[in-house]
Amino acid sequence: NLGDAKYFAGHSLGEYSALATSGSLDFKNAIKLLNERGKAMQTAVPKGTGGMVAVLGIEIKEINNLLENQSNYKCYIANDNSNGQIVLSGLNSDIDKFIETLKTKKIKNIKLPVSAPFHCKLMNKATSIMRDKINNTNFEKPKNVIISNVTGSETQEIEKIKDLLIKQIENPVRWRESVIYMIKNGVTNFIEIGPGKVLSGLVKRIDKTINVNTINKLENLNNIKLND
């Protein structure tokens, strides 16, 4: 019974799924907002000018040091996914310069096949577009506690939820901190619902002792195993 879950959390657009599942946002409005959000983010920068790169094997503190010690390009942390997996956004010209820096330091990285530099300041036009759309959409108080991508902690107040959804567009997804917050507050079982099992892998990377179940097809519902 999903209603028994202590927390709901989603990664990036998955936060809208979490809000819909918790009863805060009805399904129709969730789809409508996501459609508008997608269009707004695609038009925030000229097509083909922005990109993202995943940096593997180093921690966020080291990434911040690299970014602080350069002045000829500007990149932004977009996703703090897990220990040793950080994603950055920026203009492609800046991303390519950053990749060269990573190569000289022999730091593993993967340039991602994305259409825009999500979750960074380059999305400010999308924020402006979505502010009114989110504020003019009806939200209810969620039945379950929501973990915000922006803060990595819980929220249940309707106006705060709206404000954080707006800020989410150009702020990093603090997934690692979100998972740690839930674990520190007593969560021992995580259930990922949706295609694939990327988030399950991230949770296990953050804490190998945590029990994780993945539901990406109906038959998975009968195979869930929870720790006491």
Language-model segments: which ranges?
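FabD-like malonyl-/acyl-CoA
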Residues: 1-65, 112, 189-222
